[in-house]
């Protein structure tokens, strides 16, 4: 039997004048295709289940799955859990006192520590506490603490508040002294986030200083407003 439905179609197909119609599957061939697709779907579902299985799930599968495969997945899952634990280690702005400064800050190893020296009654200190509370929840791999300035450093001048110190392995690796460089009372949480990123205290997605971004947007808005005004003036002149 030819590839076409008629002898004429067979000739045209032979000389490349037309394409052969798709082959009609027999009932057995169709059944085999459906069976193969079902087996592939089952295998994919099984692999996904193994990848997402908890340690308890993996233990429950011991009688049904290859032990070497389960052991590899178990090790992989434990490593994932360790990484997740490190990335979610903290998550809050914790107030500490002078006796605990050493253990909470200078003796803290392998972790970035952000320390806010503050004093009650200073509005900008309150502002920084608000911003750091937000950032602590966002960057849980970094330790955020606050301490009254008079407890951290005796006779520390109020004119230097708020002060943010960044520690790593007991050393100060970054600092923000007052909010003069970040806009004073207008300092935003993004401004603080950018400064902490510059000190490598956090892994932020910010690509540039928020003040530069804001200045550019204001400049663009000003240009658009001027262009609209000029266009309006020209329209009035035409009238």
Curated annotation (Swiss-Prot):
Residues 90-239 are annotated as: Thioredoxin fold. GO terms for cellular component: cytoplasm. Keywords: Coiled coil. Residues 42-59 have a biased composition (Basic and acidic residues). Residues 214-224 have a biased composition (Basic residues). GO terms for biological process: asexual reproduction; protein folding. Residues 36-196 form the Phosducin domain. Residues 230-239 have a biased composition (Acidic residues). Belongs to the phosducin family. This is Phosducin-like protein 2. It comes from Dictyostelium discoideum (Social amoeba). The gene is phlp2.
């Amino acid at each position: 039997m030819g590839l076409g439905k008629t002898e004429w179609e067979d000739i045209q197909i032979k000389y490349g004048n037309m394409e052969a119609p798709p082959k009609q599957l027999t009932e057995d061939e169709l059944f085999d295709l459906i069976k193969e697709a079902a087996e592939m779907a089952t295998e994919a579902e099984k692999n996904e289940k193994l990848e997402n299985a908890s340690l308890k799930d993996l233990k429950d599968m011991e009688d049904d799955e290859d032990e070497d495969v389960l052991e590899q997945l178990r090790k992989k899952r434990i490593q994932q859990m360790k990484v997740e634990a490190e990335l979610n280690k903290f998550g809050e702005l914790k107030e500490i006192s002078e006796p605990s400064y050493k253990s909470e800050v200078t003796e803290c190893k392998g972790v970035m520590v952000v320390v806010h020296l503050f004093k009650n009654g200073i509005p900008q200190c309150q502002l920084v506490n608000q911003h750091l509370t937000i950032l602590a929840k966002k960057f849980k791999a970094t330790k955020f603490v606050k301490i009254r300035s008079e407890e951290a450093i005796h006779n520390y001048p109020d004119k230097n508040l708020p002060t943010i110190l960044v520690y790593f392995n007991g050393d100060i690796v970054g600092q923000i002294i007052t909010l003069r460089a970040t806009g004073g009372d207008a300092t935003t949480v993004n401004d603080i986030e950018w400064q902490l990123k510059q000190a490598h205290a956090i892994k932020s997605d910010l690509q540039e200083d928020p003040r530069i971004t804001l200045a550019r947007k204001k400049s663009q808005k000003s240009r658009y407003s001027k262009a609209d005004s000029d266009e309006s003036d020209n329209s009035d002149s035409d009238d």
